[in-house]
Swiss-Prot record:
The gene is tyrS. This is Tyrosine--tRNA ligase. One of its GO terms (biological process) is tyrosyl-tRNA aminoacylation. CDD domains: S4, TyrRS_core. It catalyses: tRNA(Tyr) + L-tyrosine + ATP = L-tyrosyl-tRNA(Tyr) + AMP + diphosphate + H(+). It comes from Desulfitobacterium hafniense (strain DSM 10664 / DCB-2).
Length: 420
């Protein structure tokens, strides 16, 4: 199957340059790229779709280039932004670029035989650019009218846009030209907001290769949306990162398992490598037995394992199951730290402290009277076990590896006692 057929079946193609020519070109191996600007020290799930697109192309026999924007990251892309980006110091951007390189290596095979992926950093050519030569040789190929007409620029004109960000599309176009010259790269892929920058690149290559038969292409993926109108990739706690130190695998797993029934089939097509037939089967289950949430569990399993590995995925599933069944006592200390990293907590040194007082210290209740009433009514659980004896001390309670006590008050309010 031509990879374009699979991508279209999954809803992953938003726009392409000459689709017929691209389809024919993809019948044999080609080199393509996608760029990732280091705007933070980690990629987030907003980057996941284009990253997985590179992986899909590599699995189909094509050669992907992951371009880290060590140069363009110093400038800032106005696409999709309503205000000017904060410019970060060069050393910070380069450090972030190195971290992003490490993350990308988890998704692409850079050592494979036949079509190994390529890692590049545009600082290599943008960092040493000669301004006069650049304006003479590259800048003359861009008309001000067409640059102003690009959606990424036009949408910012009323609010104001600096020359720095205005010139971003020229630098991105130059990236495509350099990758075409260095590696024979014939296609750029990106999000739908990148269409203007991508076509600027194809136009530049065409103008710079008059008399040559250099055909290049562009493809964009759709904007990932949520049916409830909220922004994809954002939670109450902020962005969902691919770095496990910024978003734990458990929290990552929970993001996917909480997917709306209206979105889950789309996300299975976008973010997993399950076959179309497997996804159609899960889609039928969403229609007939939505309460089982099998599609959400499969989505969370596949994406968490893809990003964080089997062990982290199994750990996330175990924590989720423990919270659902009340089997907190079966968790390890590491699993408790991961699963309860953002609940109210308190350090307790005196193990002769009454559980009643520990409830106050972690913020579960505001007074001893409220603590006693909660316990006597059966609303307090320690490591999944209901506790009604108001005379219990911390020393008398079971602990998780002698380090933690997990308290639940009511159905969903969790607190963590850390024994020090």
């Amino acid at each position: 199957m031509n990879i374009l057929d699979d991508l279209k079946a999954r809803g992953l193609v938003y726009q392409t340059t000459d689709e017929e020519a691209l389809y024919k070109r993809l019948e044999s191996p080609m080199t393509l790229y996608c760029g990732f600007d280091p705007t933070a020290d980690s990629l987030h799930i907003g980057h996941l779709l284009p990253v997985l697109m590179l992986r899909r192309f590599q699995l189909a026999g094509h050669c992907p280039i992951a371009l880290v924007g060590g140069g363009t990251g110093l400038i800032g892309d106005p696409s999709g932004k309503t205000s000017e980006r904060t410019l970060n110091p060069t050393e910070v951007v380069q450090e972030w670029a190195n971290r992003i390189k490490e993350q990308l290596s988890c998704f692409l095979d850079f050592e494979g035989v036949g079509n190994p992926a390529i890692m590049a950093n545009n600082y290599e050519w943008l960092g040493t650019i000669n301004v006069i030569e650049f304006l003479r040789d590259i800048g003359k190929n861009f008309s001000l009218g067409s640059m102003l007409a690009k959606e990424s620029v036009e949408s910012r004109m009323s609010r104001g846009i600096s020359f720095t960000e205005f010139s971003y599309q020229i630098l991105q176009s130059y990236d495509f030209l350099k990758l075409n010259e260095l590696y024979g790269c014939e296609m750029q892929i990106g999000g739908s907001d990148q269409w203007g920058n991508i076509t600027s690149g194809t136009d530049l290559i065409r103008r710079m290769s008059v008399g040559e038969d250099r055909q290049v292409h562009g493809l964009t993926v759709p904007l990932v949306t949520k049916s409830d109108g909220t922004k994809f990739g954002k939670t109450e706690g902020g962005a969902v990162w691919l770095d496990p130190d910024k978003t734990s695998p458990y929290k990552f797993y929970q993001f996917w398992i909480n997917t709306d029934d209206r979105d889950v089939v789309k996300y299975l097509n976008f973010f997993t490598f399950l076959s179309i037939e497997e996804i159609q089967g899960l889609a039928q289950e969403v229609e007939s037995q939505p309460e089982k949430r099998n599609a959400q569990r499969m989505l969370a399993k596949e994406v968490t394992e893809l990003v964080h590995g089997v062990e982290a995925r199994e750990r996330a599933e175990k924590i989720s199951q423990a919270l659902f069944t009340g089997g907190i006592a079966n968790l390890t200390a590491k699993e408790v730290e991961e699963g309860f990293s953002d609940v109210p907590s308190a350090d307790v040194e005196d193990q002769e402290m009454l559980l009643v007082d520990a409830l106050i210290k972690v913020g579960a209740v505001s007074s001893r009277r409220q603590a006693r009433e909660s316990m006597e009514s059966g609303a307090v659980y320690v490591n999944g076990i209901r506790q009604t004896d108001t005379t219990l001390t911390v020393a008398q309670l079971d602990k998780i590896e002698s380090r933690f006590i997990v308290i639940r008050r009511g159905k969903k309010n969790y607190y963590l006692v850390k024994l020090v």
